Amino acid sequence: MREIIELYRKVGGFQALHVAEAYDVLKEAVEAADVRFLSFTGNLVATGLREFIADAIRRRLFNVVVTTAGALDHDIAKSMGAVYAPGSFDLDDVDLAAKGYHRLGNVVIKKEEYGPLVEKFILAHCEKLWGKTLATYELAYLLGAELPEDSILGAAARAGAKVFVPGIVDGAVGTALMTCNDLARTKRGGSRAFIDVLKDEEELREIVHNSKKLAALIVGGGISKHHVIWWAQFKGGLDYVVYISTAVEYDGSLSGARPREAISWGKVKPSAKSVFIFADATLVLPVLLKAL
């Protein structure tokens, strides 16, 4: 993959050059930054990027992960045997729904292999959760310990990487946790599981406060992106940062904002080494991660 990076460097312009420059930033970050964030959106886990992300965590390229509930959903579903099949962006969604399929871009999955599988997994481990108050990173560890090493959560649990999910209720995992608590009321007299997101914030505060240098690879936008850069401001901003996105900045959205905008908020240092790659992550993330 490093040969491809060097080929991109020789192209000398446009996004190919940005990919080569991003590799340089990430390579230095892995060597110099003690806290290395990996932020990504859940949709990526519906693709084969799941294996690349798990491998990067397993190799300890990143030691803190911030993602969405959807990432957990897809990771668990795939671990439970769900088949995510190639399709088309132009499939008839009315027809798909009638046949019992979900569509995510040009990936399709049977409805019975998504929510029901996630719920089955969570409910199988309810008793380990009842009566506990858990941060999302603690929940992710408990779930990851029950999943194979080639999953994202499984790799993180074994590598000691903490996985934070600030929007934990926004997906099948969150709904399954609610069902888990419904069962607790009938079987355990109300000894429910509690998810304490402020405990996550306290842990992030300690991670950032105790860091010497902060780095982040941020793929996509939304809550997983903002949570990383929000906390970085309390240490003066990120020292190294690479964004990969196809969002535009002209609507003022967080997802489309470039690293330079974050400087005005104190979330990225003026001296930071930063690169923005305008590209589909499925095209460039495998190259970057395998080259490191």
From Swiss-Prot:
One of its GO terms (cellular component) is cytoplasm. The keyword Metal-binding does not apply. SUPFAM superfamilies: DHS-like NAD/FAD-binding domain. Its EC number is 2.5.1.46. Keywords: Hypusine biosynthesis, NAD, Transferase. InterPro entries: Deoxyhypus_synthase_arc, Deoxyhypusine_synthase, Deoxyhypusine_synthase_sf, DHS-like_NAD/FAD-binding_dom. It is an enzyme of class 2 (transferase). Pfam families: DS (PF01916). One of its GO terms (molecular function) is deoxyhypusine synthase activity. Pathway: Protein modification; eIF5A hypusination. Gene3D superfamilies: Deoxyhypusine synthase (3.40.910.10). This is Probable deoxyhypusine synthase. The lineage of its organism: Archaea, Thermoproteota, Thermoprotei, Thermoproteales, Thermoproteaceae.
